[in-house]
Amino acid sequence: MKTLLLTLVVVTIVCLDLGYTMTCCNQQSSQPKTTTICAGGESSCYKKTWSDHRGSRTERGCGCPHVKPGIKLTCCKTDECNN
């Protein structure tokens, strides 16, 4: 009986997604707000801004990438914190 109970507990834990998934904004520049659910293991969101011949540009997404000089990067660790 104990084995059956233990098996049910293990199956329940495996079947349920007990991990937390981060939600980040992913709209570009001045587009309407959209969000994405980040891949497992991602624990931060980013907002990258720079200027080019089209004006000020913004990119948002999951993670915290490395950027070239001249690009402003803001990383944060709460849901939709990169809006």
Curated annotation (Swiss-Prot):
Q: Which UniProt keywords apply?
A: Acetylcholine receptor inhibiting toxin, Disulfide bond, Ion channel impairing toxin, Neurotoxin, Postsynaptic neurotoxin, Secreted, Signal, Toxin
Q: Which InterPro entries match?
A: Snake_3FTx (IPR003571), Snake_toxin-like_sf (IPR045860), Snake_toxin_con_site (IPR018354), Toxin_cobra-type (IPR054131)
Location, primary (coarse class): secreted
Positions of disulphide bridges = C24-C45, C38-C62, C64-C75, C76-C81
MF terms from GO for this chain are:
acetylcholine receptor inhibitor activity; ion channel regulator activity; toxin activity
Residue span of the signal peptide, if any?
A: 1-21
* GO CC annotation: extracellular region
| UniProt xrefs under Gene3D superfamilies | CD59 (2.10.60.10)
Q: PROSITE patterns from the entry?
A: SNAKE_TOXIN
Task: Return any one Pfam family short name.
Answer: Toxin_cobra-type
**TM region(s), chain numbering:** none
**Subcellular location, in the record's words?**
Secreted
**Does the entry feature the keyword Glycosyltransferase, yes or no?**
no
Tissue spec: Expressed by the venom gland.
User: Quick check: keyword Phosphoprotein in the entry?
Assistant: no
Which family, according to the similarity comment?
Belongs to the three-finger toxin family. Short-chain subfamily. Type I alpha-neurotoxin sub-subfamily.
Briefly state the protein's biological role: Binds to muscle nicotinic acetylcholine receptor (nAChR) and inhibit acetylcholine from binding to the receptor, thereby impairing neuromuscular transmission.
Under what name is this protein listed? Short neurotoxin 1
What's the source species' lineage?
A: Eukaryota, Metazoa, Chordata, Craniata, Vertebrata
